[in-house]
Amino acid sequence: MALLNRLAKTFSPYYGLNKVEQKLLIKIDWFILSYCCVSYFINYLDRSSINNAYLSGMQEDLKMHGNELQDINVVFTCGYIIGQLPGSYALQRVPARLWFSVMNILWGLMTIFSFAVHSVRALMILRFFMAVAEASTFAGTHYILGAWYKESELCKRAGIFSASGLVGTMFAGYLQTAVHSSLNGKGGLSGWRWLFIIDGILTIPLSLYGLFLFPDVPETTKAPYFTEQEKELSFKRLPARPKKKPLTLKAIKDIVRSWRIYGLCILWIFSGETQAIAVNVLMGQWMKWSNKFSVAQINNYPTVITAVGVVSTLGASVISDKLAGNPRWPFGLFLCVITTVSATILLAWNVPDGAKFFAYFASGCTYAGQAVWFSWANDICRDNDQERGVVVFLMNMCQNIWHIWWAPIMYPNTDTPRFIKGLIGLLVVGGIVFVSSCIVSYMQIRDKRIKRSIQDAKDFDDVFTEHESLELKKIGKNDEESLNTTNAVKEISSPGLVITRQRISMPKETNAQD
């Protein structure tokens, strides 16, 4: 029984809550996570489908040659980058249920239209605008999660969301296999064209579901499934936030002057690159180069990396929320260790295949950083909703900008199978992630200390003012005694801040009688 209680305390997201809050949290989880996770799943299903379509007949049908697939993916990434800041601004002004649903419908329609393309140029144009519509999904979801969940609840939900995208990556290959075997040639369409039709159709019911049932944010929610008591509790249970204001030029200047935007963007830029072994398909390229493995093995074995990513993401999310004080920096050390071990084994190269498999599979653990770092960004910027929205989108945008030039330089296909340059870079990247996580942690602690000092000073000032008021009441209006007040210096000290208050009052005129 004690073991079951311990497991429940560790893994249950509702352990220790009263019935009212537990019921509220179950509703939030269902209506937010169900929509966001399915959306992200389809998002990654679509991203992976372009590569599967290429291998399943699209190359021949569109007469693709050279690096045209890479060019299509670069165009997609450019659209994704361009869509970040408009998406951030829109979610500050437009209800999330409207923005997400409209973007998903546009994205779904353009995915369906992809079945009709007959040139690479037409496909590039569609992929560009699909990426713009898709750009709000990832960072926008992290922004919404940060609006609904406490610091101790957030990372678990972010982990589930991140894992859903990884599952979409795994599922894409299986879906393409099923579609190609059952629909290829039906209606005069190739299997890859049917894949785009199916991917697009999946988004339409999801968009309608979000339009009517997604709850927006606690302060403005009109979701019919929340009672009035639950609506009030949904924002009262969270730390107090300043009233939401428009994103003005002054607000942008304040955000740019803060360390947060730079520290968190640098952290995610390099943390995203720790996923290089998986993202750049190094394992599949080695397996194909070695001529030891069948086509099925080359397609299926690398999915273990993604499976490891799912497990490590969920595990890191649970642990992060359960650690006392919810520290996030230890995961910088974790990513540094994983990248160092994997890169060192692969740089050595002349090791048994089993060691190579271990290095490739272990690299899947680097996916764990995504949920942890975006939860951390929400925690750090919780006191400024404008900054929080801008920072989570900029983190995602900056990482994509970095990756668009980093990957071709560090992991070109000509370096197959060893990728020595990229793996040396991976060692450096792991170290930068650890150092930057420590710096961000230090700055967060410093901010909390200053904020606590200011609050202590305010509390003291309130008490001091109340004491003065009581003293004046005691004196009374008709008190004929003179009030001689000498300099009264009140000094309080707290970590990082010293506040001194000096009160000086002139003596009243005294009677002339001796």
Swiss-Prot record:
GO terms for cellular component: Golgi apparatus; plasma membrane. Its main location: membrane. Keywords: Cell membrane, Membrane, Transmembrane, Transmembrane helix, Transport. SUPFAM superfamilies: MFS general substrate transporter (SSF103473). Coiled coil: none annotated. GO terms for molecular function: pantothenate transmembrane transporter activity. Belongs to the major facilitator superfamily. Allantoate permease family. This is Pantothenate transporter liz1. It comes from Schizosaccharomyces pombe (strain 972 / ATCC 24843). The gene is liz1.
